[in-house]
From Swiss-Prot:
Linked residues for Glycyl lysine isopeptide (Lys-Gly) (interchain with G-Cter in ubiquitin): 384, 486
Record remark on domains: The coiled-coil domain mediates a strong homo/multidimerization activity essential for core assembly of PML-NBs.
Region feature Disordered, mapped onto this chain: 1-48, 404-434, 500-599
UniProt protein name: Protein PML
Lipid bilayer topology: Peripheral membrane protein
Modified positions (N6-acetyllysine) in chain numbering: 497, 525
Primary location: nucleus
Alphabetical keyword list: Acetylation, Activator, Antiviral defense, Apoptosis, Biological rhythms, Coiled coil, Cytoplasm, DNA-binding, Endoplasmic reticulum, Endosome, Host-virus interaction, Immunity, Innate immunity, Isopeptide bond, Membrane, Metal-binding, Nucleus, Phosphoprotein, Repeat, Transcription, Transcription regulation, Tumor suppressor, Ubl conjugation, Zinc, Zinc-finger
Gene assigned in the entry: Pml
Residues reported to bind Zn(2+) 2: 77, 79, 93, 96
Binding site for Zn(2+) 1: 62, 65, 82, 85
Length: 885
C-alpha cells in the first residue's frame, strides 16, 4: 500500500539532535554526495535526452581540463575551476590570465551554486536511469524526499514519514518531468537564522542590511540598533537579482566597445601582414634583378623585416590578448548571473552576492587601452630606403665595371671643356640615353647667355647675377627632356656652375625700371617646370581674392605671374600692434620682382626609375605659421605651391576696419579648402619639431577639423635638413641667412608668407623635388600628433624635446606612456627606453644610472597625474636633463 505524500513540512533536525536519535532506522547519512565522473562506456551509451542535458550543462565542467569540476572554485575573474587545476592561491587564471586576487584569505570562493547543481543533476540522472538505490538500505528506491534530499525505498519511506512527515514524491512521477522542472522543484527557498546559538534552526524571512545576515523574529526584535534596516528577505534577494542584471547590461555595452577594439586589433594584424607581404614582394622583385652577389643581402633584409614584424606583432598581440581576456570575463560574468537567476537558490545568492558584485565592479573599471593609440602598420619605409641605397650601389659598380678604357681616358678632357659634366656617382646611376640628352642640352647652352657662380671654399656656390629664362628655345628643346633628370656638380670637383638662361628686351626693361636699392632679384619664379604633382597647366590658376590693406606698397607682378589667395582674419583678442609692421600687412617686397630666376631642372623626381609613383604624384605645399608670444595663438598662417599662394593674417582689433574680418574658424576652413584642391599634398615646413605644429593641431581639434586635415595631407617634409644635406658648408642654416646668401633676398622673419616663399625658392634652386630621396625626410601625421601629445611632458621639463621626437618617431604618445605606467607601475615604462638616444651605444654604469633617474622622474610625474596633481617641474627637470641632455 502506497502512502500519499504529506505536505506538512518540518524543519530538519541537525545531526546528533534528540529528534534524529529517536529513529533507529534513520541513520545519519550525507545529503546528496557529489557525483562520480561518468565512465567512457557511459558517455558512449548516452541517450539523446542525456546528451541534451550534458550539452545544456556543459558549463559545469572545468574549462581548463574539461572534466567534471570537483570542489569547484570561483575566481575573481568569474571563471570556475576544479581544485586540481587551481594549483595554488594567488596565481593567474589559466583561462584568461587574470591575476588571482581572491578574497581576504587569499583563497578562491567555493562555488556552492555549481556544486549544488551538480548534485541535483546526478540525482536526476539516477532517477531517469531507473537505477536509483535507497540511500539507507541500498534497495531499489521508489521515493524522493525534497527536504532530506534522499532517495528512499517503500519500506524506509513508511518509517521516514512516521517520524519526519516530509514532502516526498514517487520517482515514477519525476521521470516524466524535464530536468528543468526537477531542478526548479529542488530549489530551496528555506533560509534559516544566522544566529548559531539557536537550539533548533529557525526559518526566517527577515534580512538585516546592517548585519548583512538573515534573522529570525526573535533576533530581529533584539537587534534594536538595526531595526530601521530590517526588510523582507525575498524583496532583498529580488533587488539583488535586478542589481546584478543591471550591471550585466552595462557590461554588455562595454563589451561592444571591447568588440570594436578587438576588431581594430585584428584589422591591424591584417594590415601588418599585408605590409610585410608587400615589402617582401618588393625586396624579392628587386633582388631577382641581380646575380648571386646580392643573395646574402636579400636574406639580411628579409630577416630585418621579419624582426620588425615580430616586434610590432608582439606589441599588438599583447594588447589583443588583454582585450580577449576582458571580453571573456564579460561574457562569463553575464552567463553566470543569468544561470544563477535561473537555477541558484536564495541561500546561494546570499553566499555569493558580495563576491560577484565586487568582481563585476572591478570588471566595469576596465577600459580598452587602444582607443587613442595609433597602430604601427607602416613601419617598413626604412627598409625600402635601405633597399634603394643597396640597388644604387650595385648599379654604380656595374656601370663602372663595364665602362670602356677610352671613356676613362677621355673623361679629363671632357671635364676641362664642360665642368658640369664631371662624372659623379649620381651620373653612373643614369642610363646612357639620359646622359646623351644631358650632353645635347649642354651643347645647346653654348648659344645661351650664362650666369657665372662664384665658389667659396667650403661653401655652396653663390650666383652673381641671374636672368629670367623666358625664350621658347631652351624651354621647348631642353627643359622638357632634361628638366626631370638630376644633374649635380660637387663643388669640390668643379670651380663654377653653368646656368643656361636667355635675356630678352623685356627683361632688360625690367632691370632698368627696378628699384635702385635692389641690384638683383629678390625672388624667382620657375615658369618652365610643370606643377609639383607632375601636371603642367599654366592657365589653371586659383582665382584671386584681393583684400585691400592700408599702406600696401606691394608691387604687382606682370600678368603672367600667378595670382595669390589672401584671407585676412580679425581677432577680438588684443595683441601688440608693434608686431605688425607695414611690410607685414602687404605681400612683402620679396614676393614680386621684375627679375625672375629659373633653374634648369623642375621640381620633379630626380631618378624616375627608382622613385615611387605615389611620392612623385604628391604636391609640395610650403607651409609656415607664426605664434604670438603673449597669447600663444596663431597670428599668421601661409602656404604656397607652384601655382597659388594662401595666407591667413590675424590682426588686432584696431586694424579690422581696413580688412574684411572673418573668424579664425572660417580662415582655417579656407585653408583646408585650399589643401583639398590638390591630391593629398605634402606640407613642407622649416621646423617640424617645435611648438608651432602642436598649437596648430590643437586649434584644428577645437573646431573638430583635425581628422579632416589628416585625411587631406599625406605627410610633413622637413626642409632645413634637406638644405643642410645639399649645402653642408653653409655658414648658417637659418632661413633668413639662407635666403640672403642664395636668393639675394632680405626676408622678414616676422612674415609667414615671406618664409614659405623663401623655402619654395630655395628648394627650386637646390633641385629638391618629390621622390624616394625625400622619403627619409617625410614624417607621418601620426608621428607629429604623438609629438604634440608629449608637449605636457616637455613643458613640465620631464622629457627633453629631442627625446620626445624620438618617441614620436616610434608613434609613442602620451596616452600610451600613461596607460603603460597605469598597467605596470614598476616595469611599464622601461620598454620605451630603447627608443631614446642613450640606447645608441652600449650602456655604461653612469648611463644606466641616468636611465634610472629619467624613469624615476617620468614615473613621479605620471603618479602625480594619476593622483590628480603633477609633481614639481624642477624635480623632473633636474633628473631628465641629467639623463638625456
Amino acid at each position: 500500500m502506497e502512502t500519499e505524500p504529506v505536505s506538512v513540512q518540518k524543519v530538519p533536525a541537525p545531526p546528533g539532535s534528540p529528534c534524529r536519535q529517536q529513529d533507529s532506522a534513520l541513520t545519519p547519512t550525507p545529503t546528496m554526495p557529489p557525483p562520480e565522473e561518468p565512465s567512457e562506456d557511459y558517455e558512449h551509451s548516452q541517450s539523446p535526452a542525456e546528451q541534451a542535458i550534458q550539452e545544456e550543462f556543459q558549463f559545469l565542467r572545468c574549462p581548463s581540463c574539461q572534466a567534471q569540476a570537483k570542489c569547484p572554485k570561483l575566481l575573481p575573474c568569474l571563471h570556475t575551476l576544479c581544485s586540481g587545476c587551481l594549483e595554488a592561491p594567488g596565481l593567474q587564471c589559466p583561462i584568461c590570465k587574470a591575476p588571482g586576487q581572491a578574497d581576504a584569505n587569499g583563497e578562491a570562493l567555493d562555488n556552492v551554486f555549481f556544486e549544488s547543481l551538480q548534485r541535483r543533476l546526478a540525482v536526476f540522472r539516477q532517477i531517469v536511469d531507473a537505477q536509483a538505490a535507497c540511500t539507507r538500505c541500498k534497495g531499489l528506491a521508489d521515493f524522493w524526499c525534497f527536504e532530506c534530499e534522499q532517495l528512499i525505498c517503500s519500506k524506509c519511506f513508511e518509517a521516514h514519514q512516521w517520524y519526519l512527515k516530509h514532502e516526498a514524491r514517487p520517482l515514477a512521477d519525476l521521470r516524466d518531468n524535464s530536468v528543468s522542472s526537477f531542478l526548479d522543484s529542488t530549489r530551496k527557498s528555506n533560509i534559516f537564522c544566522s544566529n548559531t546559538n539557536h537550539r533548533n534552526p529557525a526559518l526566517t524571512d527577515i534580512y538585516c542590511r546592517g548585519c548583512a545576515k538573515p534573522l529570525c523574529c526573535t533576533c530581529a526584535l533584539l537587534d534594536r540598533n538595526h531595526s530601521h534596516l530590517h526588510c523582507d528577505i525575498g524583496e532583498e534577494i529580488q533587488q539583488w537579482h535586478e542589481e546584478l542584471g543591471t550591471m550585466t547590461q552595462t557590461l554588455e555595452e562595454q563589451g561592444r566597445t571591447f568588440d570594436s577594439a578587438h576588431a581594430q586589433m585584428c584589422s591591424a594584424i591584417g594590415q601588418l601582414d599585408h605590409a610585410r607581404a608587400d615589402i617582401e614582394k618588393q625586396i624579392r622583385a628587386r633582388v631577382r634583378q641581380v646575380v648571386d652577389y646580392v643573395q646574402a643581402q636579400e636574406r639580411e633584409l628579409l630577416e630585418a623585416v621579419n624582426d620588425r614584424y615580430q616586434r610590432d606583432y608582439q606589441e599588438i598581440a599583447g594588447q589583443l590578448s588583454c582585450l580577449e581576456a576582458v571580453l571573456q570575463r564579460i561574457r562569463t560574468s553575464g552567463a553566470l548571473v543569468k544561470r544563477m537567476k535561473l537555477y541558484a537558490s536564495d541561500q546561494e545568492v546570499l553566499d555569493m552576492h558580495s563576491f560577484l558584485r565586487k568582481a563585476l565592479c572591478s570588471l566595469r573599471q576596465e577600459e580598452p587601452q587602444n582607443q587613442k593609440v595609433q597602430l604601427l602598420t607602416r613601419g617598413f619605409e626604412e627598409f625600402k630606403l635601405c633597399l634603394q641605397d643597396f640597388i644604387s650601389c650595385i648599379t654604380q659598380r656595374i656601370n663602372a665595371a663595364v665602362a670602356s678604357p677610352e671613356a676613362a681616358s677621355n673623361q679629363p678632357e671632357a671635364a676641362s671643356t664642360h665642368p658640369v659634366t664631371t662624372s659623379t656617382p649620381e651620373d653612373l646611376e643614369q642610363p646612357k640615353e639620359v646622359q646623351s640628352v644631358q650632353a645635347q642640352a649642354l651643347e645647346l647652352s653654348k648659344t645661351q647667355p650664362v650666369a657665372m657662380v662664384k665658389t667659396v671654399p667650403g661653401a655652396h656656390p653663390v650666383p652673381v647675377y641671374a636672368f629670367s629664362m623666358q625664350g621658347p628655345t631652351y624651354r621647348e628643346e631642353a627643359s622638357q627632356t632634361v628638366g626631370s633628370m638630376k644633374r649635380k656638380c660637387s663643388h669640390e670637383d668643379c670651380s663654377r656652375k653653368i646656368i643656361k638662361m636667355e635675356s630678352t628686351e623685356e627683361n632688360e626693361d625690367r632691370l632698368a625700371t627696378s628699384s635702385p636699392e635692389q641690384s638683383w632679384p629678390s625672388t624667382f619664379k620657375a615658369t618652365s617646370p610643370p606643377h609639383l604633382d607632375g601636371t603642367s597647366n599654366p592657365e589653371s590658376t586659383v582665382p584671386e581674392k584681393k583684400i585691400l590693406l592700408p599702406n600696401n606698397n606691394h608691387v604687382t607682378s606682370d600678368t603672367g605671374e600667378t595670382e595669390e589667395r589672401v584671407v585676412v582674419i580679425s581677432s577680438s583678442e588684443d595683441s601688440d600692434t608693434e608686431n605688425l609692421s607695414s611690410h607685414e600687412l602687404d605681400d612683402s617686397s620679396s614676393e614680386s620682382s621684375s627679375l625672375q630666376l629659373e633653374g634648369p631642372n623642375s621640381l620633379k623626381a630626380l631618378d624616375e626609375s627608382l622613385a615611387e609613383p605615389h611620392l612623385e604624384d604628391r604636391t609640395l605645399v610650403f607651409f609656415d605659421l607664426k605664434i604670438d608670444n603673449e597669447t600663444q595663438k596663431i597670428s599668421q598662417l601661409a602656404a604656397v605651391n607652384r601655382e597659388s599662394k594662401f595666407r591667413v593674417l590675424i590682426q588686432p582689433e584696431a586694424f579690422s576696419v581696413y580688412s574684411k574680418a572673418v573668424s579664425l574658424e572660417a580662415g582655417l576652413r579656407h585653408f583646408l579648402s585650399f589643401l583639398t584642391t590638390m591630391h593629398r599634398p605634402i606640407l613642407a615646413c622649416s621646423r617640424l619639431w617645435g611648438p608651432g605644429l602642436p598649437i596648430f593641431f590643437q586649434t584644428l581639434s577645437d573646431i573638430n577639423k583635425l581628422w579632416e586635415f589628416q585625411d587631406t595631407i599625406s605627410g610633413f617634409l622637413a626642409v632645413l635638413p634637406l638644405i643642410r644635406e645639399r649645402i653642408p658648408g653653409a655658414s648658417s642654416f637659418k632661413l633668413g641667412n639662407l635666403a640672403k646668401t642664395y636668393l639675394a633676398r632680405n626676408m622678414s622673419e616676422r612674415s609667414a608668407l615671406a618664409s614659405v616663399l623663401a623655402m619654395r625658392d630655395l628648394c627650386c634652386l637646390l633641385e629638391i623635388s618629390p621622390g624616394l630621396p625625400l622619403a627619409q625626410h617625410i614624417y607621418s601625421f601620426s608621428s607629429l600628433q604623438c609629438f604634440a601629445s608629449l608637449q605636457p611632458l616637455i613643458q613640465a621639463s620631464v622629457l627633453p624635446q629631442s627625446e620626445a621626437r624620438l618617441l614620436a618617431l616610434h608613434n609613442v604618445s602620451f596616452v600610451e606612456l600613461l596607460n603603460a605606467y597605469r598597467t605596470n607601475r614598476q616595469e611599464g615604462l622601461k620598454k620605451y627606453v630603447h627608443y631614446l638616444s642613450l640606447q645608441t651605444t652600449p650602456l655604461s654604469s653612469s648611463a644606466s644610472t641616468q636611465v634610472a633617474q629619467f624613469l624615476q622622474a617620468l614615473s613621479t610625474h605620471m603618479e602625480g597625474l594619476l593622483e590628480g596633481h603633477a609633481p614639481a617641474g624642477a624635480e623632473g627637470k633636474a633628473e631628465s636633463k641629467g639623463c638625456l641632455a
